[in-house]
Amino acid sequence: MSKWAGIVLAGGMSSRFGEPKALASWQGSTFIEHILKVMTSALQEVVVISHSDIKERVEQFVQVPVIEDIPHYKGDGPLAGIVSGMEYIEADWYAIMPCDAPNVSQEWFTILLEQTSKEYDAVVPIINGRKQPLLAAYHNRVKEKIYALLQEEKRSMGQLLSQCNVKYIAGEDVQANADWFINVNTKEEYVQAQKDLSNE
């Protein structure tokens, strides 16, 4: 029986958004609370990776551990966050979530889990023609690859994927709803996302 863990990349202050996205309000709670509610119901263990500037605030909203990046790789982007989560929780597979996709559904994690198998290092969805490496699943064997990249100061998710045996899944092929992946980067997108969802 594989153990599944979740890693939420909460980041810190968002310059484009003007405030920490993790704490933006969403349907009566916050982005991070909504994401965690979904993840904790689908996965065995979840950890939040947060920037030191908002860690204490995030802790007030959540019931799961909130940690910072491994000191040596602090601030090295999503790869540092992912490997920090992998070090904190021992698991076979890790489902990754950014904190700015507040509309994710528990169903998504069920789909993702079903798509994993031993021969793959990662399962990455393609939504509306775009790869989504931060809404993906990674096997724990990827940890060593991430360390090797960070040591060479390579920080892009694309560089990691190029070294992995990746199973790409098109959202429409697995009945994944594109709305689950709505990604909020600016206040305009935030207003739009709230509008779109209240119209459903």
Swiss-Prot record:
| Residues at which GTP binds | L9, A10, G11, K21, D69, D100
What are this entry's molecular-function GO terms?
GTP binding; metal ion binding; molybdenum cofactor guanylyltransferase activity
Which protein family is named in the record? Belongs to the MobA family.
Reaction it catalyzes:
Mo-molybdopterin + GTP + H(+) = Mo-molybdopterin guanine dinucleotide + diphosphate
Give the cofactors, semicolon-separated: Mg(2+)
**Biological processes annotated in GO:** Mo-molybdopterin cofactor biosynthetic process
User: What positions does the entry give for Mg(2+) binding?
Assistant: D100
Superkingdom to which the source organism belongs: Bacteria
Q: What EC identifiers does the entry list?
A: 2.7.7.77
Enzyme superclass (EC): transferase
The text the record gives for the protein's domains is: The N-terminal domain determines nucleotide recognition and specific binding, while the C-terminal domain determines the specific binding to the target protein.
Mainly resides where? cytoplasm
- Protein name in UniProt: Probable molybdenum cofactor guanylyltransferase
Functional summary from the UniProt entry? Transfers a GMP moiety from GTP to Mo-molybdopterin (Mo-MPT) cofactor (Moco or molybdenum cofactor) to form Mo-molybdopterin guanine dinucleotide (Mo-MGD) cofactor.
